[in-house]
Amino acid sequence: MDNETKHVSHSDVLKAIMNDSDKTATDISRELGLNRSYVTNTAARNNVRIETLATIAAAYGYDLALIDRETNETRYIIEPPK
């Protein structure tokens, strides 16, 4: 992905992260201590919880952020659950 901001659905975000990474979805699922198909199955769903998205994004090396639309300032980083 380039540095351009993308407006996409959460499942598209997961698919893009998976495609951009050298790590496989199976690698990330196992790193999280979950079923080997967890990440792939999650990316196929239309109802991914924010906590799940934050957890998978963090495992791929990304932060999930809330950005102020008026200022384009990153206001909050959503931490995955501990």
Question: Which role does the model predict for each range below?
Answer:
Residues N19, R30, A58:
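Alpha-helical residues within the helix-turn-helix
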Residues K15, T40-N41, A54:
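Key DNA-contacting residues within the recognition helix of helix-turn-helix
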Residues E51-I67:
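DNA major-groove recognition helix of helix-turn-helix/homeodomain DNA-binding modules
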Residues M1-S21:
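A short, Lys/Arg-rich alpha-helix, primarily the initiator
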Residues G33-V48:
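Recognition helix of helix-turn-helix/homeodomain-like DNA-binding domains
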Residues I67-K82:
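Short, charged recognition helix plus adjacent turn
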Residues T24-S29:
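Short alpha-helical "recognition helix" segments of helix-turn-helix
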